[in-house]
From Swiss-Prot:
Keywords: Cell membrane, Membrane, Transmembrane, Transmembrane helix. NCBIfam families: ComEC_N-term. Its main location: membrane. The keyword Transmembrane helix applies. To B.subtilis ComEC. This is Uncharacterized protein MG316 homolog. One of its GO terms (cellular component) is plasma membrane. The keyword Coiled coil does not apply. It is a multi-pass membrane protein. The chain crosses the membrane at residues 25-45, 47-67, 119-139, 152-172, 206-226, 235-255, 268-288, 295-315, 323-343. It holds the Pfam family Competence. It is found in: Cell membrane.
Length: 369
């Protein structure tokens, strides 16, 4: 069991690093990593040695190359730049903004995006792992399966979409995770997610203080936890949305400085709407050269719905948490998830201490004659 969840435990070690880097708490970050590494040495020297190496690499990357981010380097590439030029040539105004938001993750000067931030549902209106997982799942299920044509086509489409969205971290997570799953089919999902995160961090340490990166991985941990319990589908959807919003609420509060009290309701309401417009926006592309901005009416429900949600919701104005709260909050969640995961994958673990404990021989009862 010690090595079964190796990458998962390694990822949990670095989760709080996001908050320390965000607030430039370098001394605290270094102290935290030293303490964790010393504890890991008591588990196994190889495990501790690798964690120490990862810690040193993390600090060196963040200090020497703070501006190195994969997403920034890939914003202008052979596919994304011509596509943006084509959209700018045939569309303009609000229609242009909606297409860029739903198709290529472009969020600048977009009122719908700003409304989604205030409603704490911004993850639904940008290209995320949710959308790409849906795309890959459709191809894997419905395309021709012989000679792995469905999987090869799915990976090609994911790679093209990565270039199109500028290698957004949430999209990169899906590509790396799916690739690792094909290479190591017996790997535990927690290990797959942990290794995916560590590989992305090595490619771009700036991911540690990127909202999309942290939201994507924290949401996946919640999904893994909920999927281990058999529940009624509607109840599972509500519970999943609730837990995700609870787990990511400190990050949302850090970004927005207020929380939407009706986040769960809005999340359930806008999820099918966002998925519909994600698919429909691609279907509109062939019509754009002939119809142009006249297609903007297709999106008219979105500003109306977002404005209605803003007018009817209740916002909780809370103070911005400090690093102590982040450490305690995510430390407790990490501990709870770790204990639950170990128990789920190795239920006999808790019994071993009882089995290996010193045997107590029952005292002979005096015979009664």
């Amino acid at each position: 069991m010690k090595w079964k969840l190796f990458y998962f435990f390694t990822l949990l070690t670095f989760t709080p690093a996001y908050f320390f880097i965000e607030q430039n708490q370098w001394v605290i970050l270094a102290s935290f990593l030293v303490i964790v590494n010393l504890i890991s040495l008591t588990v196994h020297w190889k495990f501790g040695l690798l964690l120490i190496s990862c810690s040193a690499a993390l600090l060196a990357y963040c200090q020497l190359m703070p501006e190195f981010q994969l997403a920034k380097l890939m914003k202008a590439n052979w596919l994304r730049t011509p596509f943006i030029s084509w959209l700018d040539q045939h569309t303009s105004g609000v229609f242009n903004q909606y297409l860029k938001l739903f198709l290529i993750n472009e969020t600048t000067k977009n009122t719908l995006y700003q409304s989604a931030i205030q409603l704490n549902i911004v993850h639904l209106f940008v290209i995320s792992g949710f959308h790409l997982s849906f795309l890959f799942g459709v191809m894997e299920r419905w395309l021709y399966k012989r000679f792995y044509i469905n999987k090869i086509t799915g990976f090609v489409m994911l790679l093209l979409y990565l270039f199109l969205v500028g290698f957004a971290f949430s999209a990169l997570r899906v590509f790396v995770s799916k690739l690792l799953r094909q290479m190591f089919p017996k790997q535990l999902p927690e290990n797959n997610l942990g290794l995916t995160a560590l590989l992305i961090i090595l490619m771009s340490p700036g991911a540690l203080h990127n909202f999309g990166f942290n939201f994507s991985f924290l949401a996946c941990f919640v999904l893994f936890a909920i999927n281990k319990v058999k529940l009624w589908k509607p109840l599972q959807a509500v519970l999943t949305s609730t837990l995700i919003l609870i787990v990511v609420s400190p990050i949302t509060l850090h970004l927005n400085r207020k929380l939407n009290a009706l986040s769960v309701f809005h999340n359930l309401l806008f999820t099918p709407i966002a998925l519909f417009y994600f698919c429909a926006s691609w279907l509109l592309l062939p019509l754009i050269p002939w119809m142009g901005n006249s297609l903007v009416g297709f999106y008219w429900p979105l500003p109306w719905l977002s404005q209605w949600a803003l007018n009817t919701t209740v916002f909780l104005n809370l103070p911005k948490p400090n690093w102590v709260f982040y450490l305690v909050y995510y430390g407790l969640w990490g501990l709870l998830y770790t204990v639950g995961t170990v128990f789920y994958y190795d239920r006999s673990l808790w019994c071993r201490y009882w089995v290996n404990s010193p045997a107590v021989k029952p005292t002979a009862q005096p015979s009664r004659l």
